[in-house]
């Protein structure tokens, strides 16, 4: 649900940052650079992460961003972990541009079963950011995986994972974060509950071997 007081929520986040980066309240000095505001406000489901209106979310995001960026100009404050739907993504980017709210980074999610679908969304997000004046805003996929999930046990999972990472080297996306490898998670297709390798594991293993070579070929 939307916080009752957007400013107070931002102040709570301020102290979380101070706790983990500045040692406040018996904290730490982790120097975490990236801080994401919210998650999947555009999921549009009763059990989703945001039950308010899109306009309420835009107000909320602007309030949080301006408060945190004013205090921590050296950090990257961004988000909002969009679900990857092109229509709602464009609405969010357009709203931030209209309000003149900077986007230190734009994060979004994608679950798919073809590399073409991956390429299509990656290029859409980059094109839309550029169109609204955010040419310098990094595009970050902070959740990606296969869908439908019944493919996770197949050899196709290995191929798709490897092909997606290869495509990501040459498409306009700045970071890709695989979601996820928690043992027992619905989204985990890297290890079984006994920590045995699943199909996607071999794509990551092979990728790790290739990265030691230092260059990629086209």
Language model segments and positions:
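Aromatic- and carboxylate-lined catalytic core of secreted/periplasmic carbohydrate-active enzymes
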Residues: 163-218
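Short, solvent-exposed turn/loop segments enriched in Gly/Ser/Thr/Pro and often Arg
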Residues: 81-84, 143, 179-182
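Active-site micro-motifs of SAM-dependent methyltransferase domains
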Residues: 43, 146, 183
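Active-site neighborhood of phospho(di)ester-bond hydrolases with catalytic His/Asp-centered motifs
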Residues: 137-142, 177
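Long, acidic, intrinsically disordered low-complexity segments
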Residues: 118, 137, 166-168
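Active-site cleft segment of glycoside hydrolase catalytic domains centered on the general acid/base Glu
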Residues: 1-105, 109-128, 149-163, 190
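A short helix->loop->beta-strand "cap" motif at the edges of active sites that frequently abuts
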Residues: 73-75, 134-137
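Active-site beta-strand/loop signature of hydrolases that rely on acidic residues for catalysis
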Residues: 40, 142-143
């Amino acid at each position: 649900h939307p916080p009752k007081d957007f400013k107070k929520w931002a102040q709570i986040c301020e102290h979380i940052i101070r706790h983990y980066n500045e040692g406040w309240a018996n904290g730490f000095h982790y120097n975490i650079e990236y801080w994401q505001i919210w998650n999947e406000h555009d999921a549009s489901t009763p059990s989703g992460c945001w039950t308010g209106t899109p306009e309420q979310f835009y107000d909320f995001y602007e309030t949080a961003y301006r408060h945190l960026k004013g205090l921590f100009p050296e950090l990257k404050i961004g988000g909002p972990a969009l679900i990857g739907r092109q229509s709602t993504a464009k609405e969010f980017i357009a709203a931030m541009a209209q309000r003149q709210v900077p986007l230190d980074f734009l994060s979004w999610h994608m679950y798919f079963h073809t590399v073409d679908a991956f390429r299509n969304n990656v290029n859409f997000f980059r094109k839309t950011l550029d169109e609204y004046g955010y040419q310098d805003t990094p595009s970050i996929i902070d959740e990606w995986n296969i869908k439908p999930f019944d493919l996770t046990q197949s050899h196709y999972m290995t191929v798709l994972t490897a092909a997606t990472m290869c495509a990501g080297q040459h498409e306009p996306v700045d970071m890709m974060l695989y979601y996820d490898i928690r043992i027992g998670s619905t989204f985990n297709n890297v290890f079984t509950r006994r920590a045995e390798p699943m199909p996607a594991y071999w794509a990551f293993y092979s990728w790790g071997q290739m990265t030691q070579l230092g260059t990629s070929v086209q």
